[in-house]
Design a protein with these regions (language model features):
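Cap/lid segment of the alpha/beta-hydrolase catalytic domain
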Residues: 440-562, 568-569, 603
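Conserved beta-propeller blade repeats
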Residues: 51-66, 101-116, 144-159, 192-205, ...
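Active-site-proximal cap/loop segments of hydrolase catalytic domains
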Residues: 510, 518-737
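Non-catalytic accessory segments flanking enzyme active sites
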Residues: 56-58, 160-162, 185-186, 191-210, ...
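Short glycine/acidic-enriched loop and turn motifs that connect beta-strands
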Residues: 72-76, 166-169, 258-261, 309-313, ...
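Short loop/turn segments that connect beta-strands within beta-propeller blades
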Residues: 88-92, 128-133, 210-213, 275-279, ...
Length: 737
């Protein structure tokens, strides 16, 4: 591996990424940008982990400066640290504001742009901002359970913050304080663990006044810790699910006010409006699936949000809804507060999923992002009764654009963009003209050899067209032969677009000498809802044929010597299933966090709504409390409609479980690597161990790698490095001469 790493003294580090001669003193534990030197022109795991990660841009009130964060990683220290930067909207050199040894997050401008608020170490701070410098910091909160996220009211006189409260899951010290060293979890209901943690605590959001000394306690929006709902919703609580009204009198929020089994099987998340002054709450939406991300129009006369229609189906079309807000009319039987009516779907005639709605400054239209035909673009819609949606980024631009974080007076959109060739950067877009603002990793990416990417539309077995990206190694020569990697997408709903990943990094794969094949098979979300929905109840059907179509297409090329199939989560399921049916199509397999035994998976995963729908139930949530045993209809058990369960009598569910990958192990004969995180509660680690054990019992060359402290993803730097090295070691062993 031809890479040189140069260690730089702190005095030199202090000058990196700054646009002036000001010297800053790095704090203990500070990690700065990498000066990695690449001598062979190839992206490698070490190069990947050296990249700075740009995130959370915020436009200043005068629309002249962007505040953002960059995380840098130390493999040796096995950690990353995030610090703050600014850059002019017009571009130029960034200014580094902090050089801390502990990460800083959620930086926000004050309304006058003279103060910057931020989180560090679980508490909120502020510091004056003058002439490109941060002044002395002042601590604003001292919350015992810490502040996880926050949002200031428009005039910065009030604060809402997210912290943790005790859940229904019991620990020994709840009944006896003397047992404070005992470790056990007790529950009498579902949803006792989520993603990677036992649910001993859940998020609640509080409101407090700013400016009266250090905040030690606020008012719980939900009414108190005895209300065991999550606000924001887990497992990744996001303050974007709460929004201050422009006058600071109200907070719109999204919440799934359910617990236990009901929480586990339902996606019914509703929009509410809370009044901090009176403590009263008005419910805006009542039924259906996820309602999230409320945003007020600038004058407060309208409220927009994202919505799914069907309860229990997390891959339903994401609609952009808007309603008119009335402050002088309250429905009978509801608490005093504004009423929202004339609710309409602005995207009814739009075939894609809306994301990240942002109001235009004049309140006459909304911007949003959407994955459309394999790339993510920015769109605009005027909220009239017959809305017209206009795409603002050209569909032939091979980038993924995020939703705008700022709109300038001339209509220029400030946003983020990525591609398979570079990670997140800040960019300005106007009439399809793109002006890149940040170049965080240009000094590293410029050292890499160039490669080519091709978009192929392949004919599927049922005569449809499937977008398949193909990446070729640098200096590709069609007269030579190369091994190929087919990526099996997780989800199963998602899209192989022009996004950037720090694990499934396609640029690195092609730089390691592989042709990389990315089929947007049935179930992907950027090609309309029918293409997405087809996969539900048909995991072993058309999408598997789509994989085989793409594999055979690339294998027929004279420059391809063999094909490996690799994937995570549902992609791991795909690998395990393909291993039992492919015959001689594939030469090697890698599965990370894959589903192996669908019956076991149904009874050990946490978010039950997903398998209950996708495994063949295809029905909305229904529950009758107090019922036990079979309901007599073949799909209701314990009062819960469970058409996607192993005990369902629905034909699609029966077919699903009859074709679980573990039942096809007798056909396995191809080398397989199984990797899994020990803290993965979405697809428990037993799935990976069972697949490996089965491969061993069949005499199939196989390897198991378990990361005890990792979840569904591999996040710690040294673990990530080992994961990548193991990935390529296995591929090279079986795919290269």
């Amino acid at each position: 591996m031809k890479i040189q790493l140069f260690a730089m003294a702190a005095t030199v580090m202090a000058l990196i990424a700054c646009n002036s001669n000001r010297e800053m003193t790095p704090q203990e534990g500070y990690i700065g940008p990498s000066d990695i030197q690449i001598t062979d022109g190839h992206m490698s795991p070490e190069v990947l982990l050296s990249l700075g990660r740009v995130s959370d841009p915020q436009l200043s009130p005068d629309a002249k400066t962007i505040l953002y964060g960059v995380s840098y990683t130390s493999i040796q220290e096995n950690r990353s640290v995030r610090n703050l930067f600014t850059i002019p909207v017009e571009g130029g050199d960034p200014v580094q504001l902090t050089m801390d040894g502990k990460s800083i997050s959620a930086a926000r401008w004050s309304p006058d742009g003279e103060v910057i608020y931020f989180l560090q170490g679980g508490q909120l701070y502020k510091a004056p901002y003058r002439e490109g410098r941060l002044g002395a910091r002042e601590q604003l909160t001292d919350i015992p359970s810490g502040v996880e996220d926050y949002a200031l009211s428009p005039d910065a006189s009030q604060l809402m913050y997210v912290t943790s409260v005790h859940s229904a899951v019991e620990v020994p010290s709840d009944s006896d304080p003397m047992l404070d060293k005992a470790q056990a979890y007790a529950t009498e209901d579902l949803m006792y663990r989520h993603w990677d943690h036992w649910m001993t605590e859940i998020p609640h959001t509080y409101v407090a006044a700013l400016g009266n000394g250090i905040i030690k306690e606020g008012v719980d929006i939900l009414g108190g810790p005895e209300f065991l709902y999550q606000l924001p919703n887990g497992p990744f609580p996001d303050i974007a699910d709460l929004a201050w009204s422009p006058d600071g009198r109200y907070i719109a929020y999204a919440c799934k006010k359910l617990e236990g089994k009901e929480y586990a099987f339902s996606t019914n998340t509703c929009i509410y409006i809370y009044c901090p002054l009176t403590g009263e709450t008005t419910q805006v939406t009542f039924e259906g699936g996820y309602d999230t991300h409320p945003v007020w129009s600038p004058d407060g006369s309208r409220l927009a949000w994202l919505s799914m229609e069907r309860d229990g189906y997390e891959a339903d079309k994401v609609r952009l809804m808007v309603g008119d807000v009335h402050y002088d009319a309250v429905p009978e039987g509801q608490a005093a507060g504004p009423m929202v009516d004339n609710i309409r779907d602005l995207t009814a005639a739009f075939k894609y999923n809306a994301d990240g709605p942002v109001w235009a400054e004049d309140g006459k239209s909304l911007y949003f992002a959407a994955l459309a035909e394999g790339v993510e673009g920015i769109f605009n819609v005027v909220p009239e009764q017959e809305p017209v949606i206009v795409r603002l980024t050209a569909d032939n631009l091979w980038f993924d654009f995020g939703s705008p974080f700022g709109v300038l007076q001339d209509g220029t959109l400030l946003t983020t963009f990525t591609s398979m060739d570079f990670p997140t950067e800040l960019v300005a877009v106007n009439d399809n003209a793109i002006r890149q603002i940040t170049y965080e990793n240009q000094h590293i990416l410029d050292q890499l050899d160039k490669h080519e990417t091709e978009a192929r539309w392949l004919k599927t077995v049922d005569g449809q067209e499937m977008l398949t990206w193909v990446l070729f190694p640098p200096k590709f020569d069609p007269a030579k032969t190369y091994p190929a990697i087919e990526i099996c997408l997780g989800g199963p709903q998602g899209t192989l677009s022009q996004g950037w990943s720090y694990r499934w990094n396609y640029l690195m794969m092609c730089h390691q000498g592989y042709v990389v094949v990315l089929p947007n098979r049935r179930g992907t979300t950027a090609f309309g809802q029918p293409w997405c929905e087809q996969i539900s109840g048909d995991y072993v059907g058309l999408n598997m044929q789509d994989y085989l179509t793409a594999a055979r297409n690339i294998k027929a090329e004279p420059y391809v010597s063999g094909v490996a199939a690799c994937g995570a989560s549902y992609g791991g399921f795909s690998v395990y299933y393909l291993a039992g049916i492919h015959k001689d199509v594939y030469d090697c397999f890698i599965a990370h966090a894959g589903i192996f035994n669908e019956e076991h998976m149904y009874m050990t995963t946490e978010e039950m709504w997903f398998p209950n729908w996708d495994n063949g139930g295809l029905h909305e949530y229904a529950y009758e409390e107090g019922e036990t045993g079979p309901g007599g209809d073949g799909i209701t058990f314990g009062g819960i409609k469970q058409g996607g369960s192993p005990w369902s009598n629905l034909p699609k569910a029966k077919r699903h479980y009859d074709n679980s990958p573990h039942k096809l192990v007798r056909n396995w004969n191809t080398p397989i690597l199984c990797m899994h995180g020990g803290m993965d509660f979405r697809v428990p680690v037993d799935e990976g161990m069972a697949a490996f054990n089965a491969a061993q019992m069949m005499g199939v060359p196989s390897k198991l790698i378990v990361f005890p402290g990792e979840n569904h993803w591999i996040l710690k730097p040294q673990n990530a490095l080992y994961w990548h090295r193991s990935y390529f070691d296995w591929l090279d062993r079986w795919m290269k001469d």
